């Protein structure tokens, strides 16, 4: 990108490999792809059609005597094999199989994977191979009913993720990616938007295994410059994104743009339409999508559209989110619509009793406003079943050198987890209560506000395990039941002077903290 509200780091920060090949090999240099492409079609519980395409490379030799074989494995069991006739001079091999009764890749519930192996032989001797995992699935979005995976409703509840963290910037170790994914799955995500640029292939591989749906995208961010070199760069990045990641079952969408704005430089509509056509040509099996914050014609160019909206943070009122969604849906009922970004800043070291809308560009971002923001926004989003997705902005705090806000300069603090991944903010547990129904828990919000300035308080708790009882210094304050978004509240509780041990319990667990009241 030529601009963006995030840091763009340079340098080599992924693995480096030395490729040593025979004179004939499976093509390693076709847009840095694997040279092997698996295309699924007509997938159902009854059968799945798979087209296999392999590209070969030959240096100063012919491909005479070369043969390509495809093998499909279920775990370690060989299910089928198919061999090509001798490879032609176009150095391209096409094969087809039909798999009866495939075990489907079914998201986080059952991310079942097969293994596809492509073997190149010359004069009967194996000289190259590729092994890639295959997950058979079918999916679609409906403008009125939302998203479906394998024929069943599957609302995509997810987060945005920048590949950026304390001490590493973008230079992640594999365990850093794993930690991010562990935190997302603890919260209950079933999808991740890998914003706003191609991220590590290791991330895609792990999302295949974990069943997390991936939205991947090119860095066409904010502005467009009507320039042949700019256009060609966009085309090249889209080709690389699609061809390098073509076989990953977790990737269901190709993202073409984020917050492109006709009012800043040149109009981006022509380029958005061209990128859509290119993506459909390269991969007709996946829809295109864009993330927009504009009311413009390009919102209708992609197969799916989602919007970045921050009602209740950058001005406006919290309730405007639902009203705006309904107006947009009524104006364009044919569009398959989702929410790609919504969020509010929070610093875990800034706490207050009062609930006041902070200045987003100011230095005071109390945690309780972020919590309130997400509770109120999720109430509105969950009610609108026609939305095919909702992605929180964002999972982790990240670096943005141009920002002068919150407690740390150069930091976007809208994450649900801190930049170093050490502290989960209250809003993290709110979403865990709504999205994760397996890991039963109760959690007291506001526990970091230890020194209280009010004697009378409301106690707020998040629970995915039903009702809970409140105790303060051992005294019972009754039972509260969760509301429609799994929030429990005890209103008007009078604290004791001095130390107050707050404890919440139910049959699945407990949580406690200490609040100090000087009055």
Task: Label each residue range with its predicted role.
Residues 169, 178-184, 191-434, 438-458, ...:
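Substrate-binding/catalytic cleft of secreted carbohydrate-active enzymes
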Residues 1-196, 200, 204-214, 237, ...:
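Secreted/periplasmic carbohydrate-active enzymes, especially glycoside hydrolases
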């Amino acid at each position: 990108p030529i601009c963006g509200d995030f840091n763009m780091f340079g340098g080599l920060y992924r693995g480096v490999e030395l490729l040593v090949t025979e004179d004939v090999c499976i093509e390693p240099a076709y847009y840095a792809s694997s040279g092997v492409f698996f295309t699924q079609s007509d997938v159902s519980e009854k059968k799945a059609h798979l087209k296999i395409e392999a590209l070969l490379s030959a240096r100063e030799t012919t491909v005479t005597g070369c043969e390509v074989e495809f093998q499909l494995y279920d775990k370690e069991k060989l299910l089928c094999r198919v061999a090509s006739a001798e490879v032609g001079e176009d150095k391209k091999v096409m094969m087809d199989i039909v798999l009866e009764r495939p075990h489907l890749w079914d998201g986080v519930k059952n991310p079942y994977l097969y293994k596809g192996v492509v073997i190149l032989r010359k004069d009967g001797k194996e000289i190259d191979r590729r092994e890639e995992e295959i997950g058979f699935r079918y999916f679609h979005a409906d403008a009125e009913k939302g998203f479906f995976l394998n024929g069943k409703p599957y609302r995509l509840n997810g987060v945005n993720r920048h590949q950026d963290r304390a001490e590493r910037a973008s230079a992640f170790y594999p365990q850093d990616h794993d930690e991010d994914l562990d935190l997302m799955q603890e919260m209950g995500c079933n999808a991740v938007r890998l914003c706003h640029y191609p991220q590590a292939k290791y991330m895609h591989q792990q999302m295949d295994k974990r069943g997390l749906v991936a939205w991947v995208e090119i860095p066409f961010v904010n502005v467009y410059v009507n320039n042949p070199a700019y256009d060609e760069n966009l085309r090249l990045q889209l080709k690389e994104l699609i061809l390098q990641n073509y076989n990953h079952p977790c990737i269901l969408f190709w993202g073409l743009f984020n917050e492109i704005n006709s009012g800043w430089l040149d109009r981006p509509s022509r380029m958005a339409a061209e990128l859509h056509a290119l993506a459909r040509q390269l991969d007709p099996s996946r829809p295109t999508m864009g993330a927009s914050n504009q009311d413009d014609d390009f919102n209708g160019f992609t197969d799916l559209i989602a919007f970045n909206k921050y009602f209740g943070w950058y001005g406006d009122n919290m309730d405007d989110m639902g009203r705006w969604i309904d107006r947009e849906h009524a104006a364009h009922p044919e569009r398959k619509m989702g929410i790609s970004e919504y969020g509010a800043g929070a610093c875990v070291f800034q706490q207050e009793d009062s609930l006041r809308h902070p200045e987003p560009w100011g230095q005071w971002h109390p945690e309780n406003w972020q919590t309130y923001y997400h509770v109120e926004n999720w109430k509105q989003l969950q009610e609108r079943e026609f939305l095919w997705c909702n992605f929180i902005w964002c999972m982790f705090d990240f670096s943005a050198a141009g920002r002068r806000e919150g407690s740390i300069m150069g930091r976007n603090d809208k994450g649900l987890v801190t930049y170093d991944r050490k502290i989960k903010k209250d809003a993290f547990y709110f979403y865990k209560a709504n999205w994760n129904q397996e890991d039963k828990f109760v959690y007291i919000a506001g526990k970091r506000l230890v020194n209280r300035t009010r004697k009378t308080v409301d106690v707020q708790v998040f629970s995915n395990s039903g009702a809970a009882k409140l105790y303060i210094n051992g005294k019972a304050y009754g039972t509260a039941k969760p509301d429609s978004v799994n929030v429990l509240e005890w209103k008007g509780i009078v604290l004791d002077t001095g130390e107050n041990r707050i404890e919440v319990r139910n049959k699945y667990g407990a949580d406690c903290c200490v609040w100090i009241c000087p009055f």
